[in-house]
Regions:
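N-terminal secretory signal peptides that target proteins for export/translocation
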Residues: 1-2
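Bacterial N-terminal signal peptides
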Residues: 5-17
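Extracellular/lumen-exposed scaffold segments
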Residues: 22-268
Length: 268
């Protein structure tokens, strides 16, 4: 995928245009391969959080990426520092699929997708306006980084049923938390490999393991093997920080024919 042509024209990408906003959502921002907007549920909850989605409508034949694309690609990024009364925003990702399109292997979505996001208010009882700088890759045979600012006033239509339904459905589609019978166990590896044992229901041939390179980690595509009736994924560690972090962990998603789960694994 490194050989894909990259087309970047600043904040005005290709034939990009802004379509009118409605309800507690931003205007659609359109580019050659699709369009993107922010949708919110409107009202903040008691903890000062507003739920929303980054809604990505892809044209047929186009794709976008998971939190760690793989060989190449641009993961979705959301910067809310220009917002009013928004402290931060956390993106979540539905289970990706693994693809090999001849240019490289990548993890993501070749269909329209809504990425859930939680906005945290700086002051829970005060009004907020979201000004989100969005950066993501939408690719076909060329890869077009989409770069724009999406603005939402969540209180403009806080009881909009369509917006609330989209947000609710998108959060419901996220992988469930990993558990003992559907998750991974980290096995002994070495400085250059991450090895995990996968526990899951369903067909072993349909299972896949995705781990996100964060905190200066970079991973290759996993290989599969079997040991004592268990499916083993061995993931090359292509790069790593000089010192292993002691806080947090690496996001992973495990998929199977029966669904998907996600969790954090210790830094290798």
């Amino acid at each position: 995928m490194q050989s894909l042509k990259i087309l970047l024209l600043g904040t005005a990408i290709g034939s990009a245009a802004v379509l009118p906003a409605s309800a507690s959502s931003s205007a659609w921002y359109t580019s050659e391969g699709g369009k993107v907007r922010l949708v919110t549920s409107g009202k903040a909850d008691g903890a000062g959080r507003i739920r929303g989605v980054l809604d990505i409508a892809l044209k047929p034949g186009w794709k976008t990426y998971w939190r760690d694309p793989g060989d190449a690609g641009v993961p979705p990024q959301l910067d809310v520092s220009a917002s009013t009364n928004i402290a931060d925003a956390t993106l979540s990702f539905p289970a990706p699929q693994r693809h090999d399109d001849g240019y490289g292997k990548w993890a993501g979505y070749n269909y329209p997708v809504s990425l859930p996001v939680v906005f945290k208010l700086s002051a829970a009882k005060e009004l907020a306006v979201i000004d989100a700088d969005v950066f993501l890759g939408i690719c076909e045979t060329i890869c077009i980084p989409v770069q724009t600012r999406l603005t939402v006033d969540p209180g403009s239509d806080p009881d909009n049923a369509d917006d609330a339904a989209l947000v609710k459905a998108s959060f419901a589609a996220l992988p469930a938390p990993a558990r003992s019978d559907f998750g991974i166990n980290v096995l002994p590896g070495d400085h250059e490999t991450l090895v995990v044992e996968a526990n899951f229901p369903g067909d072993p041939d349909a299972a896949d393991f995705f781990v996100a390179g964060e905190r200066d980690y970079m991973f290759g595509a996993p290989s599969r093997s079997e040991k004592d009736g268990k499916l083993i994924f061995t993931v090359p560690i292509l790069d790593r920080p000089s010192a292993t972090p002691t806080d947090g962990g690496l996001h992973y998603t495990l998929t199977s024919s029966a669904g998907a789960v996600e969790g954090l694994l210790p830094f290798p």
